[in-house]
Every structure is written in structure tokens, then in C-alpha cells.
Amino acid sequence: GFAPEIRVAWAQCRQEQTDAVLATIVSRHGSMPREVGTKMLILPDGSTAGSVGGGIMEYRARQLAGKMLTGTEAPQQLASFATGLEDDEKALAACGGSMELFLQVLAGGTEAK
């Protein structure tokens, strides 16, 4: 299901017919703050509803979502993120955590299931 803040934000997007990106954790490895299935809605202005763990991972997810919303990236993506440093291998070694997110553009006039 969806957290209440995601439902509220998505209802606003639908009312305004504004697209958004839904990010869902589909796998995680090592030490991570959120569980598989956790969702976050990324709005066109870069703001979010919900959280997939914060920090650099959410920053990178917001960057990718922005590109998806402008059409410079495919509307569905499976992306890997690691905590910590810029280099993912160093980040995995330093913090011991990584995750995969499935990101999909939701059209503002559609229902989220």
C-alpha cells in the first residue's frame, strides 16, 4: 500500500493533472534504513512524499526522476544506488548498503494502484 503522505501528494497531482515519479525499493543489500516495498513519490519540483532512505540515494533518485519527467530518460527505470561516497563500490565497502529502485512515471490523470 501507500503511506498517507503519498496518497495526499498523488491526489494533488491528479487534481492538477501533473505527472510524478513513483520510486519503490525492489531489493536491498547490507545495512539499509528501509525495507523492500517502501515507496516515495517524486514531484516535478523535486520535492518528495515518503522516503526510501534519505541522503545521497534519494538525491540521486530525484535527479533521475527529473530526467524521466522531462523525457530525457525512459519513463520506467530499474536503478541501483549505494549509500555514502560518490563511487558506488567505495560506498558499498564503506557503508555496507545498496538498493535497487524501480522508478515509474505516473501520468497525472491516472489511478495509482
Located regions from the model:
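Segments forming oxygen-rich coordination pockets for charged ligands
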Residues: 1-113
